[in-house]
């Protein structure tokens, strides 16, 4: 199994707290969310939160020879999940965690995370990655953001078909197919 495939499944697992239990599969739901994005504007994240989520998502999966998180509309994907699937309590905790990320950035010399140097951004995200077990605040928000970024990235059509080259090979059951035994 390739590294990106492993990360895809891990991302789906990390995003499960936001996904309703009646969904057929996490992958199918992610693909459906991407289909629904269309021209839907951000509804939960304000402009500052959009910029923060976009910056962090791109740090998690940057643009290289393959598309980055923003190229496959991961920030919009996250906003749609927050808007339509997260409970009011989950949404409030996530948004409070985003505020906490900016508060922690102030301790590193900038009033907002997006204004930190690249090295300081990585330093803060590394610290938050170690604090993901927190039940609230920046650690929780970063853990959810990381999971949703990976989930949104690997369930996008561009990544699934063009990067991972996933092809569905099940064409359904075909009964009464002529059979000639090999001699």
Q: Over which residues does each language-model region extend?
A:
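C-terminal segment of N-terminal export signals and the immediately downstream linker at the start
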Residues: 1, 17-55
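N-terminal secretory signal peptides and thylakoid transit peptides that target proteins
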Residues: 1-14
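Compositionally biased, low-complexity repeat tracts
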Residues: 7, 26, 34, 168-171
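A generic secondary-structure signal for well-formed alpha-helical elements
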Residues: 14-22, 26, 64, 132, ...
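Mature-region segments of soluble proteins
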Residues: 37-38, 50-59, 66, 73-183
């Amino acid at each position: 199994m390739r590294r990106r495939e492993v990360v895809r499944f891990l991302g789906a697992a990390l995003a499960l707290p936001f996904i309703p239990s009646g969904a057929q599969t996490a992958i199918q739901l992610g693909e459906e969310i991407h289909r629904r994005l269309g021209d839907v504007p951000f509804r939960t994240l304000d402009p500052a939160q959009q910029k923060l989520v976009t910056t962090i998502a791109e740090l998690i999966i940057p643009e290289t020879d393959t598309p980055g998180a923003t190229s496959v509309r991961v920030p919009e994907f996250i906003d749609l999940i927050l808007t339509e699937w997260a409970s009011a309590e989950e949404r409030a905790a996530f948004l409070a965690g985003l505020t906490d990320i900016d508060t922690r950035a102030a301790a590193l010399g900038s009033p907002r995370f997006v204004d930190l140097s690249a090295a300081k951004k990585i330093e803060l995200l590394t610290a938050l990655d170690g604090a993901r077990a927190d039940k609230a605040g920046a650690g929780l928000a970063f853990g959810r953001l990381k999971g949703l970024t990976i989930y949104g990235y690997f369930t996008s059509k561009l990544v699934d078909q063009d990067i991972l080259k996933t092809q569905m090979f099940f064409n359904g059951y075909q009964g009464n197919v002529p059979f000639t035994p090999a001699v």
